[in-house]
């Protein structure tokens, strides 16, 4: 049986029923593609947790494929998802092989973000990895807006993303506990692609892939995706 609270009580399982006019659609699809590529190359017998997984799209998909993957979310519960705060995960030290945390940290207040990253490092095995995506407050369009209007373009409302911050600040937090092995930018917010994404998101998915491949310096992108390895003492 599923239990929903927060935005899932209000909006339903919106990641499972994607709206074609959702402006975030092209970025979401690219992010999920990268996550699936990682999981496909991961040992299914390893211990995997998707922290802040929402409806558990990846959790349910890969459990059906035989993976040892569990979700954890404050606002969702199902047979494969534990409804709890992952800051109080209850997991043993060095007990997890892979953590996914996709577009979650920005929903947390600043002090809790570093606590979350430290908790990931605590529960990961010595060879453990964390796959984390976070939006970048200092993306290209946001910088233009600040230059001309004195105002940054937030990645969502301040109520929804209280922890919105420039990507360099996230990286400083990651570097305290992890080694950044890879970093990739999605959706460089140049004027043309930004306008088209707002007007017709489902029609520019291919254009996003092209931009992401050739024209996406991470510092200018809306979303950054990181592969982190646990920093050993």
What is the role of each PLM region?
Residues 8-30, 57, 61, 110-125, ...:
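S-adenosyl-L-methionine-dependent methyltransferase catalytic module, highlighting the catalytic core
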């Amino acid at each position: 049986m599923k239990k929903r609270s927060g935005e899932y009580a209000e909006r339903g399982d919106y990641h499972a029923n994607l709206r074609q006019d959702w402006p975030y659609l092209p970025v979401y699809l690219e992010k999920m593609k990268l996550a699936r590529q990682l999981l496909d190359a991961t040992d299914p017998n390893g211990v995997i947790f998707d922290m802040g997984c929402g409806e558990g799209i990846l959790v349910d998909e890969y459990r059906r494929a035989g993976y040892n993957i569990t979700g954890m979310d404050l606002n969702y519960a199902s047979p494969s998802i534990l409804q709890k705060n992952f800051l109080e995960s209850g997991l043993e030290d060095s007990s997890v092989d892979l953590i996914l945390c996709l577009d979650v940290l920005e929903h947390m207040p600043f002090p809790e973000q570093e606590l979350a990253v430290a908790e990931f490092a605590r529960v990961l095995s010595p060879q453990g990895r964390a796959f984390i995506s976070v939006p970048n407050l200092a993306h290209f369009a946001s910088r233009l807006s600040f230059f001309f209007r004195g105002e940054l373009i937030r990645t969502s409302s301040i109520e929804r993303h209280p922890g919105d911050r420039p990507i360099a600040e996230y990286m400083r937090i990651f570097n305290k506990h992890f080694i950044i092995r890879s970093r990739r930018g999605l959706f460089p917010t140049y004027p043309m692609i930004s306008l088209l994404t707002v007007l017709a998101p489902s029609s520019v998915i291919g254009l996003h892939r092209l931009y992401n491949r050739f024209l996406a310096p991470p510092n200018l992108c809306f979303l950054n995706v990181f592969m982190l390895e646990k920093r050993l003492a």
